[in-house]
Amino acid sequence: MKNRCFWVSESQLYIDYHDKEWGEPVYDDATLFEFLILETFQAGLSWITILNKRENFRKAFDHFDYKKIATYSDNKYESLLQDAGIIRNKLKIKSAIKNAQLFIEVQQEFGSFSKFIWSYVAEKPIVNTFHKREEVPATTLLSDKISKDLKKRGFKFVGSTVMYAYMQAVGMVNDHTTDCFKYSKK
């Protein structure tokens, strides 16, 4: 049996997410946007709640097509509020639309969102050597800095805790614990 990080439950969905996605470096803007949306909706909730609704989010939000989301009408916003398959939080839905618009602005400024976000770690994942749950932080000075920059640009639901979870999800930091089979020093 494989040793996994402490937070992985018995849920096959969680196991697959941990084994195939979490901590794997993502440089593709479409996937970076998907995780931005999912992490912002996760604020205040458990990640398994988001994973359980991920396909519903994908369907409701046009496969996380940020160009489409950036142009959502009031009617589309209202239909999202009625969609029981997603988290129906008014502020989070509005922020998804606004964040899509701002995501495009960042792309225009930097050439891609990937160039922007990965510049914070010099395009290379930070590999941590955490042994126990207590060592893994909820925020860091770097997540504080990224959060502050995104907020200054107008992004919503991008507090430091959300941004650190985002950094973990997209592989900017490798926080697999040293006893996990996915841990790597590279």
Task: Give the positions of each predicted feature.
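HhH-family (HhH-GPD) DNA N-glycosylase catalytic core used in base-excision repair
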Residues: 1-186
